[in-house]
Design a protein with these regions (language model features):
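Basic, polar low-complexity surface loops/patches
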Residues: 1-91
Length: 91
């Protein structure tokens, strides 16, 4: 799976946010964000995936955005062309 420097940078510093990266195939959540999201949606499936940086990353993919954003609506949210950032979910 392709992982960009943007994703690696965001997730390497992430302690309390959920970053949902917008891939053509659909939304994907990596590493710390995947762990945070699993807390709110234990029914989601987290995988360990070998990515383009030759490392294994925790990944949740194939999620539906609407129920996730509805459930996390009480948290501030930033929307970008490449990702959605839900802030402060684990403070």
């Amino acid at each position: 799976m392709e992982i960009t420097d943007l994703i690696i940078g965001k997730e390497s510093e992430n302690i309390s946010d959920i970053y949902i990266f917008l891939y053509e195939e659909g939304p994907v959540v990596f590493d710390a964000s995947a762990v945070h999201l699993l807390f709110y949606f234990p029914e989601m499936e987290m995988e360990s995936v070998l990515c383009s940086d030759r490392r294994r990353h925790r990944v949740i993919r194939g999620l539906a955005l609407e129920p996730v954003l509805e459930r996390l609506a009480q948290y501030p949210c930033l929307v970008d062309d490449e990702y959605i950032r839900v802030m402060g979910v684990c403070e």
